[in-house]
Amino acid sequence: MTAPEANTRRKIGIMGGTFDPIHHGHLVAGSEVANRFGLDMVIYVPTGQPWQKADRVVSPAEDRYLMTVIATASNPRFHVSRVDIDRGGGTYTVDTLRDMRSQYPDADLFFITGADALAQIVTWRDWESMFGLAHFVGVTRPGYELDDDIIPEVHKDRISLVDIPAMAISSTDCRQRAAEGRPVWYLVPDGVVQYIAKRGMYQAHPGS
């Protein structure tokens, strides 16, 4: 009798974000989720034009992309995609997932995002169709609980929460510190610190 074939489908994490700048919380989150779910790789996807952040100045996409490349370079499981940047127009998660599904048709996708963002998922474009494209992982500070009323019962098995202590770091705080001339060492990777300084980023518009 032939033994059943092992499940050979790859498991790929997709972490979308503005990454303005990327910080250690993003990297720890990717590593922890990869370990928790046995992911083969985690692809960081910097947004092109984030529709949720039209109320503040966002750094140029190329700067955010390069900072993400620098930050992830030392981890062979981490990769960076330009799919959202090169698509043009507003960035919507459903488009990201459809593009990734086309690129990796034989993989199980896990979309990694902040639990606070996940709490707003019903406001996202074509949000119900996204659950057929990926499992959603909300990373959060320890003790956070997602309101049971937010997600319809039918989709709750497609969502997991993972506590990440390092999520106490925020890009907003990093931008503000840089704007005020305060150090961001140990909040963001060394190469990103140097990139921010070289480019003089966040001096005029720290954002919110």
UniProtKB/Swiss-Prot annotation:
Cited function: Catalyzes the reversible adenylation of nicotinate mononucleotide (NaMN) to nicotinic acid adenine dinucleotide (NaAD).
Source organism, top-level taxon: Bacteria
Keywords noted in UniProt: ATP-binding, NAD, Nucleotide-binding, Nucleotidyltransferase, Pyridine nucleotide biosynthesis, Transferase
InterPro entries given in the database record: Cyt_trans-like (IPR004821), NadD/NMNAT (IPR005248), Rossmann-like_a/b/a_fold (IPR014729)
Gene designation per UniProt: nadD
SUPFAM superfamilies attached to this UniProt entry: Nucleotidylyl transferase
Protein name: Probable nicotinate-nucleotide adenylyltransferase
EC assignment: 2.7.7.18
Family to which this protein belongs: Belongs to the NadD family.
Gene3D superfamilies (alphabetical): HUPs
GO terms of molecular function: ATP binding; nicotinate-nucleotide adenylyltransferase activity
HAMAP family to which the protein is assigned, alphabetical: NaMN_adenylyltr
PANTHER family hit by this protein: NICOTINATE-NUCLEOTIDE ADENYLYLTRANSFERASE-RELATED, PHOSPHOPANTETHEINE ADENYLYLTRANSFERASE
Record field: catalytic activity: nicotinate beta-D-ribonucleotide + ATP + H(+) = deamido-NAD(+) + diphosphate
Annotated pathway: Cofactor biosynthesis; NAD(+) biosynthesis; deamido-NAD(+) from nicotinate D-ribonucleotide: step 1/1
Pfam families registered for this protein in UniProt: CTP_transf_like
